[in-house]
Amino acid sequence: MAGVKALVALSFSGAIGLTFLMLGCALEDYGVYWPLFVLIFHAISPIPHFIAKRATYDSDATSSACRELAYFFTTGIVVSAFGFPVILARVSVIKWGACGLVLAGNAVIFLTIQGFFLVFGRGDDFSWEQW
């Protein structure tokens, strides 16, 4: 039952993050949909972790080169997702208010992704690996 509560909480927080992102695009004062390209960063951010999890077999090791490279790529993706709306606002493609809403949405969505891996990545019987 605890896994179901966690799944509902993660779904709710993901919906809040996407709401911030959509508000940054769809409000009448902003009306520009360029910030939606951060959804690409949200979609590809877990991919390095998936690859590193499949490529490394020793779970006892504290660190491996493959896992560290996955952390590096994931960090680059997350920093790019936060930098993209700032660059768009800096060159006046979007307004700074829209940038703030997109950055708030990014923070909530990436914390939701991290929470998903913390809750469901333990390898127990209610794990995402079974899906």
From Swiss-Prot:
Tagged with keyword Transmembrane: yes
Residue ranges that the Swiss-Prot or TrEMBL entry lists as coiled coil: none
Pfam families cross-referenced by the UniProt entry: Vps55
GO BP, sorted A to Z: late endosome to vacuole transport via multivesicular body sorting pathway; negative regulation of growth hormone receptor signaling pathway
GO cellular component: endosome; endosome membrane; Golgi membrane
Membrane topology term: Multi-pass membrane protein
InterPro entries (alphabetical): Vps55/LEPROT (IPR007262)
Keyword Transmembrane helix in record: yes
Predominant localisation class: Golgi
Spans through the membrane: 7-27, 32-52, 69-89, 100-120
Subunit: Interacts with LEPR. Interacts with RAB13.
Described purpose of this protein according to its UniProt entry: Negatively regulates leptin receptor (LEPR) cell surface expression, and thus decreases response to leptin/LEP. Negatively regulates growth hormone (GH) receptor cell surface expression in liver. May play a role in liver resistance to GH during periods of reduced nutrient availability.
Protein name in UniProt: Leptin receptor gene-related protein
The organism of origin for this protein: Bos taurus
